[in-house]
């Protein structure tokens, strides 16, 4: 079983920044309040909450003056496949949900989950313990989530993660979303007919390809806007928008302000 690199993070970002994830995983909010956004929804994570998210890019903001502290637990495909195989008989008792998995799931931490997290943190502080103990604690955590009130949705998401065509699509889209292709070209380059491509895309992302591509480009442009000195028109072109005016409209619709206002806010915040 693959070794898992669990990371303790400290964030202090009062404005939305883009966080990219190449793996699926769990966030445990130890302190503070964090807002996560995808293309269709905002998720507010409070202290004492846990968040499961699928790989991809999200806009994230810390909602408190003090830095937020989080624990990030990556869940590689090989680890999840082993977990599902090892506990397949037990997990088969949970009702199946065949709907499209949600990209994010928030869990309230119950007393038993809290105890499990404390045990995991205690092991992480001991460098003399074998890594298998960490893996066992994570498996315990996953089982508790699977048998929680949202266990059906959680397990549905885990089962989809082991689907190879879906993993291949995610990798393909992350590598090519900036291409100026028509949708039929995306499907052809992926090796599918347009209808089949749309169906697979809906299963993986729960939204249309056009909506996902637009969201991904906006997040990429947002990252450029806040972290480099490129002009707004150059950022619009770099992110695949046909014009600066279209980019400005899309950005305002997504973040509630113009690109110029966002850049000024960034300057005022960071000094």
Curated annotation (Swiss-Prot):
<keyword id="KW-0010">Activator</keyword>
<dbReference type="GO" id="GO:0043565">
    <property type="term" value="F:sequence-specific DNA binding"/>
</dbReference>
<keyword id="KW-0805">Transcription regulation</keyword>
<feature type="domain" description="HTH araC/xylS-type">
    <location>
        <begin position="167"/>
        <end position="265"/>
    </location>
</feature>
<dbReference type="InterPro" id="IPR009057">
    <property type="entry name" value="Homeodomain-like_sf"/>
</dbReference>
<feature type="DNA-binding region" description="H-T-H motif">
    <location>
        <begin position="232"/>
        <end position="255"/>
    </location>
</feature>
<keyword id="KW-0614">Plasmid</keyword>
<dbReference type="InterPro" id="IPR054015">
    <property type="entry name" value="ExsA-like_N"/>
</dbReference>
<dbReference type="Pfam" id="PF12833">
    <property type="entry name" value="HTH_18"/>
</dbReference>
<dbReference type="GO" id="GO:0003700">
    <property type="term" value="F:DNA-binding transcription factor activity"/>
</dbReference>
<dbReference type="Pfam" id="PF22200">
    <property type="entry name" value="ExsA_N"/>
</dbReference>
<keyword id="KW-0238">DNA-binding</keyword>
<dbReference type="InterPro" id="IPR037923">
    <property type="entry name" value="HTH-like"/>
</dbReference>
<dbReference type="InterPro" id="IPR050204">
    <property type="entry name" value="AraC_XylS_family_regulators"/>
</dbReference>
<feature type="DNA-binding region" description="H-T-H motif">
    <location>
        <begin position="184"/>
        <end position="205"/>
    </location>
</feature>
<dbReference type="InterPro" id="IPR020449">
    <property type="entry name" value="Tscrpt_reg_AraC-type_HTH"/>
</dbReference>
<dbReference type="InterPro" id="IPR018060">
    <property type="entry name" value="HTH_AraC"/>
</dbReference>
<keyword id="KW-0804">Transcription</keyword>
<dbReference type="InterPro" id="IPR018062">
    <property type="entry name" value="HTH_AraC-typ_CS"/>
</dbReference>
<comment type="function">
    <text>Transcriptional activator of the Yersinia virulence regulon.</text>
</comment>
<protein>
    <recommendedName>
        <fullName>Virulence regulon transcriptional activator VirF</fullName>
    </recommendedName>
</protein>
<keyword id="KW-0843">Virulence</keyword>
